[in-house]
Amino acid sequence: MQIVFRLTFVIEQVVPVVPVSKISVAEEILSKVGFSMSWHHNPGQNLMYAEFTHPDGISVHASESRGDGIGPVVVYFRVSNVDELAALAGATAEDQTWGTREFWLRDADGNAYRFGQYL
């Protein structure tokens, strides 16, 4: 038996939520690769939630609430020119045995931001 889904919606984007001690921790790393804070919300209790958006439309959320995830996390970005982006971030991309070229950035809370492209 084959199940056929008739979707009336489109998943536009998957947005990771990165747990951080302070929003500035995520901002420091993400700004190196072209992201900027597009909005933030402070629900009280000295907690903050923010969205960082890249000019190409990709978003990453950061949350000071440890209830949003276990953390630290790894966020993987597939990019079209990893060497150019690595140079912008002050990093060096390297070929991996699994057929990609990648570099990593790590924030002060231990979250890893990994950027790569297929070889």
Segments predicted by a language model, with ranges:
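Conserved short beta-strand elements that form part of the metal-binding/catalytic scaffold
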Residues: 37-73, 113-117
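Non-catalytic surface loops within mature trypsin-like serine protease
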Residues: 20-22, 56, 66, 79-81, ...
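Short beta-strand-to-loop elements that line the ligand-binding cleft
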Residues: 18, 39-42, 93-95
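Residue-level marker for the onset of beta-strands and adjacent loop->beta junctions
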Residues: 14, 48-49, 73, 99-101
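Vicinal oxygen chelate
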Residues: 21-24, 74-112
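Short glycine-enriched loop/turn motifs at secondary-structure junctions
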Residues: 9-12, 67-72, 97
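Conserved acetyl-CoA-binding loop of GNAT-fold acetyltransferases
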Residues: 31-38, 91
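N-terminal beta-strand motif that seeds the catalytic metal site of vicinal oxygen chelate
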Residues: 1-27, 33, 75, 116-119
